[in-house]
């Protein structure tokens, strides 16, 4: 039986150790910090942000964030088996709505990955947008299904969907 390990640490440290040991994976599921850069006056929000990221500055410029994400994807490439897939869940912030698109473009231009599919996650418990009350509530988030460009032909995305879970 295959063993499954979970590590609660910076993904770059985990991937470095995996590379050193020659470990490979078939699937990467990643939901990185969204680079929201949003200030909050609420004590609860500040406590939650501090507990979520010990050392990550979630307020980079779009260019810094794109480079950081692209570096992570270049490391994904080193640990991903042939025909492996990345599920990348990312969203757009209220104050930096372009960050997601700038980073996605950087991945597509600076790595050998491509978007094979996109899943739209309808969040059942989407909260009202109290950070910027003049913006729409974020009720969906994309999950990009990403594979290597040269492996797209073997990406089997056309199987019949047998069931779809209702989330909202």
Predicted regions and their residues:
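Core catalytic lobe of class I
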Residues: 2-168
